[in-house]
Design a protein with these regions (language model features):
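Catalytic loop of the DD-peptidase/beta-lactamase superfamily, centered on the K-T-G motif
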Residues: 1-129
Length: 129
């Protein structure tokens, strides 16, 4: 029996990925259509695995299918506490910052290296004064 990674083989356009992120930002609703219940989004965004466990990223906990910023100073990010999102292996990245009312999507096919934090910084510096 062959088991593949849960994210392997998933494809999307940048526009649809943005719509997905916007739906999460709107507590499960997109263009007047309910996709997920507000409770489902709340559970996704809640920290279920804290950063205090060994091997975890300081300042970032894990919700259900998203990483959640728990301390932006420890994470060295401009994103607000409570921001959430996910990154793919080949350079895709999205996040929602509810406090700043920002949804951002990065679609790249390059190793992640510093591209993701540089993208976060550029977007937040452009929109948050």
């Amino acid at each position: 029996m062959l088991f593949r990674s849960g994210g392997w083989g998933l494809y999307s356009t940048a526009q649809d990925y943005f719509r997905f992120a916007q739906m999460l930002a709107n507590n499960g609703e997109f263009n007047g259509t309910r996709i997920l219940s507000p409770r489902s989004v709340e559970l996704m965004r809640a920290v279920h695995v804290p950063d205090t466990l060994p091997g975890r990223t300081p300042g970032a906990g894990w919700g259900l299918a998203v990483r959640v910023v728990t301390d932006n100073a420890l994470r060295d990010t401009y994103l607000s506490k409570g921001s959430f999102g996910w990154s793919g292996a080949s350079g895709t990245h999205f996040w929602v910052d509810p406090d700043a009312h920002i949804v951002a999507v990065l679609m790249a096919q390059v190793p992640a290296t510093s591209l993701r934090p540089d993208f976060e910084t550029a977007v937040m510096q452009a929109f948050v004064k």
